[in-house]
Amino acid sequence: MGRKWANIVAKKTAKDGANSKVYAKFGVEIYVAAKQGEPDPESNSALKFVLERAKQAQVPKHVIDKAIDKAKGNTDETFVEGRYEGFGPNGSMIIVDTLTSNVNRTAANLRTAFGKNGGNMGAAGSVSYMFDKKGVIVFAGDDADSIFEQLLEADIDVEDVEAEDGSVTVYTAPTDLHRGIEALRAGGVAEFQVTELEMIPQSEVTLEGEDLETFEKLIDALEDDDDVQKVYHNVDGL
């Protein structure tokens, strides 16, 4: 499972990094976090968390600095968080999280992306009840049992710890993600491959042939939208 999360980050960086989309999206997220609090990660935990994730995605320093400098200025640009839910082929389900300065534009774009790529957008709650929100932490290691004990001793609400292919994956209650990261740091973990709040499907479906091709095109269309921050789904192997 650790390899799965690391591969997701690597594939996203490889796909989006070529045209700087991932950098632009992180720029918006960093700006919003810095604007809502202090533009200093030491006194702004939300900003610190975003910067940690930006580092994992290899976002260049100049992009980060530009977003923080923008937040320090007098700009009044406002971004709104949103969530959209929908369906793809053969039982596939999708959740899309957005950060946008124009909600009407975003809703129209996503509806078009679903409609043109074999899917359809559903009502709020039509999909999310089949997913669970969890903190996901991945780092190099192989001893799941000792990590589990370490987190329990730190009073972290840890749901599961898995070790596979040289990586440890920790699942926490969403409210304990940040505390879990700090507990692991205190225990000697210096670098993290993944630190994310994720929507984990309660069950997965397997797609093949044309269904898989259609689904991949749908995911690409959604992720290519500038206002989309995250896309979650229940398809195995992707």
Swiss-Prot record:
GO BP of this protein: regulation of DNA-templated transcription
A cellular-component GO term for this protein: cytosol
Predominant localisation class: cytoplasm
Entry's localization field: Cytoplasm
Gene Ontology molecular function, alphabetical: DNA binding
Keyword Iron found: no
Key words of the record: Cytoplasm, DNA-binding, Transcription, Transcription regulation
NCBIfam families membership: PRK00110.1, PRK12378.1, YebC/PmpR family DNA-binding transcriptional regulator
Family of the protein in this entry: Belongs to the TACO1 family. YeeN subfamily.
Protein name from the UniProt record: Probable transcriptional regulatory protein SMU_1789c
Organismal lineage: Bacteria, Bacillati, Bacillota, Bacilli, Lactobacillales
